[in-house]
């Protein structure tokens, strides 16, 4: 272990580590406490690792309290003795792995043993290069603060002086009011905030009800959410003429956070993070900054462990599914000819049901033993 720590200190040049881009996530291989594992990289998680509790990393040494968009919960931890990403050795001092019961491969629809958080890269000048699917660990001598951005394709940002082990950056509503949104590669959506935050900055009228409400899944459970059309926001210094945000229909759980900017926005940029100097560099390589509304049938479905089948958990009122008579509790047998007979992740189910606005999807259902076949349009379930 001492030799690994010495090597971590000695590494001073540029080190590149490839990662895999899943549909809405970064998957990276790492050796943790001698185990070869794969992780979803999540800058929104302030710790080091969250690992499936069925994987042995050593004796449990403590507990950690975790927070997501919905609430808080406690999990057991294991002290880390070694961490390595490719040829990059990470000093594991004071790092812990949270041991949590979860099937991450099931969640991310690719082999995944857990989550790698911001703490792993925090002490480095780290580039998340989406363009070439790799991390670039730059030498400490690289000072992005000396760069001059053009504020069209390149942007230099100062981290806000709030939060712990988090990258809080400035976001402005169309009326200029500030939102505190963390840079969060683990959020699969474009931008996620809360209903009370929209009310505070004047983007939603208090006590008014959204027309289209769906259900989203986070670590602490299911939560009502909906999509809001936003025109003229400025996200991390970038002018965004039109975008669609996911809104959690619960109050924000922290005065220091209004939500996060997620994968849907970040995937358009190469990002350099220098936490010690409190600076972030963005390079827009795709030419895109906004997102398109998701085409939805109005069905929320997921695998039911007790019934051993995919079942409908919610039908959005006034949606194509509601108009077709689909009901909560119906079993989903196949989507566009793909059988759903085995265990399948909710992200994969959603990817089959949803798609571009204006396209169609054919779904086979069963209800009380009776088979039904329906062709549904995918529509934009957007709240103006």
Language-model-derived ranges and their functions:
Residues 1-9:
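Sec-dependent N-terminal signal peptides
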Residues 8-384:
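Pepsin/retropepsin-fold aspartyl endopeptidases
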């Amino acid at each position: 272990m001492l030799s690994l720590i010495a090597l971590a200190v000695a590494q001073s040049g540029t080190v590149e580590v490839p990662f895999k881009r899943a549909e809405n996530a970064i998957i990276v291989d790492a050796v943790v406490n001698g185990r070869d594992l794969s992780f979803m990289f999540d800058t929104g998680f302030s710790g080091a690792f969250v690992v499936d509790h069925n994987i042995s990393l050593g004796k449990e040494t403590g507990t950690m309290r975790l927070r997501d968009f919905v609430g808080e919960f406690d999990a057991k931890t294991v002290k880390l003795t070694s961490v390595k990403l490719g040829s990059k050795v990470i000093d594991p001092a004071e790092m812990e792995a949270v041991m949590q019961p979860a099937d991450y491969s099931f969640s991310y629809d690719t082999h995944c043993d857990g989550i790698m958080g911001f703490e792993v890269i925090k002490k480095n000048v780290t580039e998340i290069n989406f363009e070439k699917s790799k991390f670039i660990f730059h030498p400490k001598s690289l000072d992005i603060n000396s760069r001059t951005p053009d504020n069209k394709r390149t942007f230099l940002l100062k981290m806000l002086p709030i939060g712990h082990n988090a990258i809080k950056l400035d976001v402005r509503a169309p009326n200029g009011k500030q939102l505190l949104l963390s840079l969060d590669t683990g959020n699969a959506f474009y931008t996620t905030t809360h209903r009370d935050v929209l009310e505070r900055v004047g983007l939603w009228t208090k006590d008014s009800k959204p027309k289209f409400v769906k259900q989203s899944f986070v670590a602490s459970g299911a939560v009502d959410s909906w999509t809001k059309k936003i025109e003229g926001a400025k996200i991390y210094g970038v002018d965004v003429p039109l975008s669609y945000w996911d809104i959690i229909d619960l109050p924000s759980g922290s005065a220091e956070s209004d939500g996060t900017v997620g994968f849907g926005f970040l995937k358009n940029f190469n990002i350099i993070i220098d936490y010690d100097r409190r600076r972030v560099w963005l390079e827009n390589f795709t030419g895109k900054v906004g997102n398109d509304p998701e085409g939805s049938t109005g069905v929320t479905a997921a695998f039911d462990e007790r019934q051993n089948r995919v079942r409908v958990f919610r039908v959005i009122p006034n949606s194509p599914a509601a108009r077709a008579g689909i009901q909560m509790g119906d079993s989903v047998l196949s989507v566009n000819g793909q059988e759903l007979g085995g265990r399948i992740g909710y992200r994969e189910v959603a990817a089959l049901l949803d798609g571009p606005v204006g396209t169609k999807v054919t779904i086979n259902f069963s209800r009380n033993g009776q088979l039904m076949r329906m062709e549904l349009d995918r529509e934009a379930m957007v709240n103006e």
